[in-house]
Amino acid sequence: LADRYDYIYAAVGMHPEPAGQQPADYLAQLERLAKHPKVVAIGEIGLDYYWAENPPRELQQQVLRSQLALARELRLPVIFHDRDAHGDSLAIVKEFPDVTGVFHCFSGSPEMAQELLGMGWYLGFDGPVTYKNARRAPEVAAVTPLERMLIETDSPYMTPVPYRGQRNDSSYVRLVAEKLAEWKDIAPAELEHATLGHGKRLLSIIAPEQDPPAAM
């Protein structure tokens, strides 16, 4: 798809859920793929402690560190997955101070957000910002400057209101933008324009003449 369409780019990485199932030469394979001109990030990588059947934490951490080292070597940003692993995720990225990227679908505390922002990371906001029980999201948004915000959908999951419970769609990213714009007291169009620019800057994307709708 990235080869076929000018406005589609790719990221490559080993998600934490299959950690331990990778071939012995997986890092060499990732490095080869990451050198493709349309690959703009290493990801989605990280830690996932939510499911009991997920690989052991130590194994997930080992795979994560190896990929962060690859991102450092290739000077690529990271798309980070952190589910119920906030403490270990923060501790490990601190080991790689010259690697940054986006904590996608950020669910940590405002304090964690501030630490990541101080290290140069972006934070990704998605469907849960529209939920009535989203108590932490407004607090995180309050401490996150517009310059470090990205919007996403995490399709087909995390569907925003009023479509919650249905399959998510990338076009619903506008609903995320509208809620964040409300919290930031700015026009949705301003937030959409800003976050699109942030995404391009983070991923070093030179956009085609006509941009597709803003979505990550």
Description of each model-found segment:
Residues 14, 105, 127-129, 153-155:
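Short secondary-structure boundary segments
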Residues 2, 90-103, 203-216:
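Short, electropositive alpha-helical surface patch
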